[in-house]
Regions:
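Outer-membrane translocation/initiation segment of Type V secreted surface proteins
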Residues: 96-181, 188-190
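Fold-core signature of tandem repeat domains
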Residues: 13-15, 22, 26, 30, ...
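Extracellular/lumenal ectodomain signal focusing on beta-strand-rich modules
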Residues: 28, 54-60, 80, 86, ...
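N-terminal segments that cap or nucleate solenoid repeat domains
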Residues: 1-4, 148-214, 241-249
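Well-ordered, non-membrane alpha-helical segments in soluble/globular domains
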Residues: 12-13, 75-78, 106-107, 111, ...
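Tandem-repeat/low-complexity and Cys-motif detector
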Residues: 1-6, 29-39, 52, 100-104, ...
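Extracellular beta-strand/loop-rich repeat segments of large surface/secreted proteins
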Residues: 17, 23, 27-106
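Small-residue (G/S/T/A) turn/hinge positions that recur once per unit in extracellular repeat modules
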Residues: 8, 19, 24-25, 39, ...
Length: 311
């Protein structure tokens, strides 16, 4: 801090020490420095759940997902009643080293809310929308898992929260939806939100109800072109399987590819029992103006009932 005009740079604030819950609270503003014109090197490390009034003058925000984090609550809850602004989306980081994929279900991803401010969060710095310049949704990827970080409105302004979701896009061969899972809108075995190739996944539905759809593989891409700000169009699916062996679904897909350039090959649906009240697709390219190819996909009906069409 300075009462003058000098630089306040290279400063670090840690919320929590990774070994236990942050039991304190800060009603006021946590600042990396007092000079908003130069925040170089000012870093806020969020190591567990914390409530503070607001934050300002940080170049970098680092969220460490470790065992002390309660995923039922936002890691950084901003309660002061004013917008949190002038953040740099390009300098927001998440440490996922301790994550293993635990918590990912067939009907919902692993999810943690990184930060929340009901009064608003903005990644606009002067004339720069750093969210667009940073390519939109951020990601961390391992061999089979992806973690997608995005604002609640997928924009750099007007957001109220930033969350991270985890998906398995490859090799999820034991995914199951059973009677104990009850009723949900949809379930999947392999899924990407950032255009990865979804491959080698199998979902077996043996009970319960899915009111929208069941997917062997589901492909989306929420990343953006850094220059144009437009959503990217890549992402494909191969060798995914949906097995309907009981329960009820609406539509069923070996793979649903929602990217314009994406293709689908060698995906499979088998129906041996249960009911599909809608349509069944070996694979479907569902993006408007889809340019990819759907080849070598298979549907086998051995039992059960399909009310709609089979493609």
């Amino acid at each position: 801090y300075t009462q003058g005009t000098g630089a306040t740079t290279g400063n670090i604030v840690n919320l929590g020490d990774k070994t236990g819950t942050f039991t304190g609270s800060v009603t006021g503003t946590v600042a990396g420095g007092s000079n908003a014109n130069n925040v170089t090197g000012n870093t806020l490390n969020i190591n567990t759940n914390a409530n503070v009034g607001n934050i300002e003058n940080f170049e970098k925000l680092v969220f460490d997902l470790n065992s002390t984090v309660n995923t039922a609550n936002a890691m950084l809850n901003l309660t002061g009643g004013a917008v949190t602004g002038s953040l740099d989306w390009r300098k927001l980081e998440v440490n996922t080293d301790s994550l293993t994929g635990a918590g990912i279900k067939t009907y919902e991803p692993y999810r943690v809310k990184l930060m929340e401010n009901t009064s608003g969060i903005s990644f606009q710095k002067g004339t720069d929308n750093t969210y667009t310049l940073g390519g939109g949704a951020k990601s961390a990827v391992t061999e089979k898992l992806e973690y997608v970080i995005d604002t609640n409105n997928s924009l750099g302004t007007g957001a109220t929260s930033v969350s991270m979701e985890g998906y398995q896009f490859k090799g999820n061969t034991a995914a199951a939806y059973a009677a104990a899972d009850g009723t949900h809108a949809e379930a999947w075995s392999g899924r990407t939100k950032i255009g990865n190739k979804v491959e080698g996944n199998t979902l077996t539905v043996s009970g319960g109800s899915l009111t929208a759809a069941a997917y062997g593989g589901l492909v989306e891409n929420t990343k953006r072109n850094i220059t144009t700000g437009q959503l990217l169009t890549t992402g494909s699916a191969a060798e995914n399987t949906l097995k309907l062996a009981g329960g009820s679904i609406k539509d069923g897909y070996g793979a649903d590819v929602r990217t314009k350039e994406g293709g689908a090959e060698k995906n499979v649906v088998t129906v041996s029992a249960g009911t599909a009240t809608g349509d069944v697709y070996g694979a479907a390219l569902t993006a408007a103006g889809a340019k990819g190819q759907a080849t070598g996909n298979t549907v086998t009906i051995a039992g059960g009932a399909v009310t709609g069409d089979v493609h």
